[in-house]
Amino acid sequence: MRSLLLLSAFCLLEAALAAEVKKPAAAAAPGTAEKLSPKAATLAERSAGLAFSLYQAMAKDQAVENILVSPVVVASSLGLVSLGGKATTASQAKAVLSAEQLRDEEVHAGLGELLRSLSNSTARNVTWKLGSRLYGPSSVSFADDFVRTASSTTTASTPRSTSATSAALQSINEWAAQTTDGKLPEVTKDVERTDGALLVNAMFFKPHWDEKFHHKMVDNRGFMVTRSYTVGVMMMHRTGLYNYYDDEKEKLQIVEMPLAHKLSSLIILMPHHVEPLERLEKLLTKEQLKIWMGKMQKKAVAISLPKGVVEVTHDLQKHLAGLGLTEAIDKNKADLSRMSGKKDLYLASVFHATAFELDTDGNPFDQDIYGREELRSPKLFYADHPFIFLVRDTQSGSLLFIGRLVRPKGDKMRDEL
């Protein structure tokens, strides 16, 4: 492979961002969110806006099926580009984030604060293992000032040189697998260029429900990828009280499921029937989501969800370019001289790899609720066909994740007419 030969040696800047790896100095107590500074709160709002523009850009790519991105992690990557860039290269990174009025250091520091708060597993009782690494070719050395600033805001280690030949990319894959408990064994299979910087994010996220699913309420069902193609998946079922809205005009349902400690929630949007998600995606904006959520009411809902792990790796380079990040990825125009001290570096790839697990785990549920009148005749939310989902922070409104499930893992079951 050409890329293996090119990456004979590289410098490395690593940021271990997960709370499991390095916890904030003043960790919030369980169930208590840290109060964000004004700049971090502003960037939380900006990252939520980025979530929808990036999702829409990816949804238009015919080669993409399942989508799974963490907008706050992508925003943090943009912050690193603005910190290490100059002139238009830096200003474009901030423009994609709608943070033009903030200084580069403020953007990077604010995003670091936001990400540390959102990934605090002690406060939130979720599993979020997150690692971020910046690789450069062996000919490039990271500037001391850049390393110092990046380290002070993202708990990054100092750069180090790692010699490798054909094992260079394999070492990245091994790190990603270790970071995600083996859920992501290969994140660099689509590497084409290694003469520039590689920014790699690897994540494993597992929400813990505010009210768990019963482990026996799991069985094998069909998930209809299309009307004529069905795969077998494990589905988990439970009935409870959830925020719910049925938009009969647009023929879609939306349900909000609180996660443990209720600091964040999983929001699922699903068409009434099996159809491509294009129609729903055209409706989806930050403003429209707010309208839908404003119409939600607490109702009894019988929910069925696919159980298992969704593993997705994206190279976001071209999608970020479509949003305006054109200079950083251009070998002839990029000015990342605050990273290396000279204009000898460009952003070759932005790998964003995530394993997202839906399981039954969560807090014990109140068994007495099942004798109440309010749980009779529940609304049905049967997620057996493609849907869009978001993990939203209840305090800041920022999105930890946004994605769609179009084709889960599973064997073909049957053709349907």
From Swiss-Prot:
Key word Phosphoprotein present = yes
Site note Reactive bond homolog applies to 376-377
Modified positions (N6-acetyllysine) are 206, 318
- TM annotation in the entry: none
Q: Which residues carry this modification: N6-succinyllysine?
A: 94, 295
- Modification type Phosphoserine: residues: 141
Recorded GO MF terms: serine-type endopeptidase inhibitor activity
Any one Gene Ontology cellular component term annotated for this protein: endoplasmic reticulum lumen
Sugar attachment sites:
120, 125
Q: Signal peptide: which range, if any?
A: 1-18
Q: Does the keyword Endoplasmic reticulum apply?
A: yes
The UniProt entry's GO biological process terms, in alphabetical order, are: collagen fibril organization
Q: Which InterPro entries match?
A: Serpin_CS, Serpin_dom, Serpin_fam, Serpin_sf, Serpin_sf_1, Serpin_sf_2
Per the annotation, the residue ranges of the short sequence motif Prevents secretion from ER are 414-417
| Subcellular location per the Swiss-Prot or TrEMBL entry | Endoplasmic reticulum lumen
- Keywords associated with the record: Acetylation, Chaperone, Endoplasmic reticulum, Glycoprotein, Phosphoprotein, Signal
What function does the entry list? Binds specifically to collagen. Could be involved as a chaperone in the biosynthetic pathway of collagen.
Q: Tell me the protein family, please.
A: Belongs to the serpin family.
The protein's name is: Serpin H1
